[in-house]
Amino acid sequence: MKDKIPTDYDRYLFHQGSHYKSYEFLGAHPCEENGKTGVRFSVWAPNAAEVRVIGSFNNWDGNINPMERINDSGIWTTFIPEAKKGDLYKYEILTKYGDTRIKSDPYAFYAERKPKTASIVYSLNNYKWNDKKWMDKKKDYTVYNKPVLIYEVHLGSWKRKENGDYLTYRELANELVEYVKDMGYNYIELLPVAEHPFDGSWGYQLTNYYSVTSRYGTPEDFMYFIDKCHQNGIGVILDWVPGHFCKDDHGLRLFDGTALYEPQDPRKAENEWDTLNFDFNQPEVWSFLISNAVFWFDIYHIDGLRVDAVSNLLYLNHGKGDGEWVPNKYGGHENLEAIDFIKTLNKVIFEYFPNPLMIAEESSAWPLVTYPAHLGGLGFNYKWNMGWMNDTLEYMEMDSIYRKYHHNLLTFSFMYMFSENFVLPLSHDEVVHGKKSLLDKMPGDYWQKFANLRTLYGYMMGHPGKKLLFMGGEFGQFIEWNYKQGLDWLLLDYDMHKKLQNYVRELNYFYRQEKTLWEGDHEDGGFEWIDPHDSEQSIITFMRKNKDGSDYTIIVCNFTPEVRHNYRIGVPEFKEYKEVFNSDLEKFGGSGQKNSTIIQPSEQPWHNRPYSIEITIPPLATIFFKPLNQ
C-alpha cells in the first residue's frame, strides 16, 4: 500500500494526454503514508478556487479536509487517515465565481446506488482471479479466422427475480453464463455497466466511468462474473461510451465551475441525446478516456470494447442542422481531434493487451474503420455492419410476394462484405421505439413469422462476418425489449418458441464446428456466388470456403413460402452432396421438407459451373449442403 501522491512524471503525462493509467494516482486510494493507513484523494480541477473532501468520515463538513493544489498542475490532493474502504465521499468545489459545486469523483471505483450519488472508497486489488488459462490463451488467439457468436445482454432486464429485483452479478455469473454456454455463444456483450443515474438511458448516459454500476453488486462481484465467463470459455465485451456524458449535476458537467470535460461552445458541446460531448482539444480528457479503456482491460480482464456512437465522434455536424455546429480549422465537418483520439486509443489498447476486440458502432460510410492507423485507418479491428442490418431487416419485413422486386436489398451487402472486418448485428437498437421485436417484424401468419426468422438466422450464419444477437431473439420474444422487466421466459412453455430456441442452439453449434462458415470471413476466397440472380423466386445460392479453399459449404436461402422441387444449382465438383443443416425440420417448427437422401451429381453445366445437382428447397428456409469426399 505505497503512497499514491501524484509524481511529477504522472502529472506531466496526464497533461500531455498520454497517461494511460491515470486511475492509479487520481481518485481515492487506500494506502499507507508516514506509517499511517488512510486514503489519498486526488482530483483534477484546475480552475477551482478551493477543493475539499467531504464524506462519512468527517460528517460531510468541508472545513475539516481541504485539499492542497500541487503547484500549477490543476491537481488537488490530500491524505485522510480517518478514511477507509467503504466510506462515502464527494468533492466540495469552490469555484472562482464564488459558488460551490458538490461532485462525485470522476475516477471513483464504486458509487452509491441511484438515486444517491456519493462515491465510495474502494480497493480493486483484493480479488483472486481464476482465469489464467483464458488469459494465457489470448496471447496467441486471434478471432479473424475463428467463430464469433456474440450474445448481447442488458443485465437489468435479461431476467428478474419474482419480486422484480435485479439478479446480482454473482447470480448472473451462474444463470446467464450457464445459459449462454448451453446456447453455444462464445462472447457476451454487455450494454454499458459503468454507473449511470437514469435506467431509461440503458447505461449510455454515464456519470462515473470507473465505477461498475452498484445496481447488481460490488466491483468484486463483477470480477467474479467475468471470471466465471472466462472459466466457461466465454469472452466479455463491454459497450463503452467515450463520446458524451450525462449532464447530471454531480457528474462531469462544469466540474470545477468551468467547462472542463466538455467544450465551452454549446455548438460543440450539445448533441442529439441531450448529453454533453467530450472536448477532445483537452489532453487531460484523452488521459481520462484512454485510461478508462485500459482500466477495463487491466483491472476487469475484459476481452473487448464495443465503442458506441463513433459517428458522433467523427463528425462535428452529426445530428445537427446549419448553424448548430462549428467547422474545423479547414472548414470541414470532420472532428480532427476526436479522430486522432480514436487512432491513439486503438493503438494503445493493441499495444497494451494481446488480441483485444475493438469494435466500432459506426453507421456512416467513413472509410478504413478497421484498418490500422499507419495505413490511414481508425485502428479498430471490427465494425458493426449497419448497412447489412438495415437492408436485411427492410427486406425481411416485406410480405414475401413483394420481395422479388427488392432482391438487391438481399444481395447488396455482398458487394462490400470484405471492405471492413464486419460484425453482423441484430442488436437492442432494432427491437425498441416501435420497431417491434424481430419475430413480430416478420410478415405472414404465426407459422410464417417463425419460419421467416429461422430463415433470417440461417442466412446470417452463412453471410461473411461475425454474428451478434440481442437477448430474447433466440427464443422469439414477441413484444419489444423493455428495460423495466425481464424477458418473457414463459414463452418457452409454447412449442414454437421452444423449437426456435432449439434451432438457434443447434445452428450455433453447427456454425462453430463448420470451419467454412468462418475461416474465410475476411478474405475474398472465403465466399463465392453460385446464383445471386433468382429474384423471381426470391432464392439466393452461394458457397463459403475454408481458409485454404479445400473445403466448402453450399448455402441456399428461400425467402418465399413456396416449396421448390427439382431446383437445379451449379456445383464445382462431380461429387455426391448431402444436406447437413435445414431450418425447416419439424423439430425446429418447420414443415419437414428436406433432402433426406444423398444427392447425385449431374454432368449438366449450370450457373457457369461444370456440374449441377437437383434439390428440394423447403418453404421459407435456409439449407446447407456439403460435398461427400469420395
From Swiss-Prot:
Keywords for this protein: Carbohydrate metabolism, Glycogen biosynthesis, Glycogen metabolism, Glycosyltransferase, Transferase
Involved pathway(s): Glycan biosynthesis; glycogen biosynthesis
UniProt-annotated catalytic positions: D308 (nucleophile), E361 (proton donor)
InterPro entries for the chain: A-amylase/branching_C (IPR006048), Branching_enzy (IPR037439), GlgB (IPR006407), GlgB_N_E_set_prok (IPR044143), Glyco_hydro_13_cat_dom (IPR006047), Glyco_hydro_13_N (IPR004193), Glyco_hydro_b (IPR013780), Glycoside_hydrolase_SF (IPR017853)
One of the GO biological process terms: glycogen biosynthetic process
A Gene Ontology term for the protein's cellular component: cytosol
UniProt GO MF annotations: 1,4-alpha-glucan branching enzyme activity; cation binding; hydrolase activity, hydrolyzing O-glycosyl compounds
Stored CDD domains: AmyAc_Glg_BE (cd11322), E_set_GBE_prok_N (cd02855)
Entry EC no(s): 2.4.1.18
One Pfam family it belongs to: Alpha-amylase_C
Catalytic activity: Transfers a segment of a (1->4)-alpha-D-glucan chain to a primary hydroxy group in a similar glucan chain
Function: Catalyzes the formation of the alpha-1,6-glucosidic linkages in glycogen by scission of a 1,4-alpha-linked oligosaccharide from growing alpha-1,4-glucan chains and the subsequent attachment of the oligosaccharide to the alpha-1,6 position.
Quaternary data: Monomer.
HAMAP family: GlgB (MF_00685)
Homology family: Belongs to the glycosyl hydrolase 13 family. GlgB subfamily.
The name this protein goes by in its record: 1,4-alpha-glucan branching enzyme GlgB
Gene it is expressed from: glgB
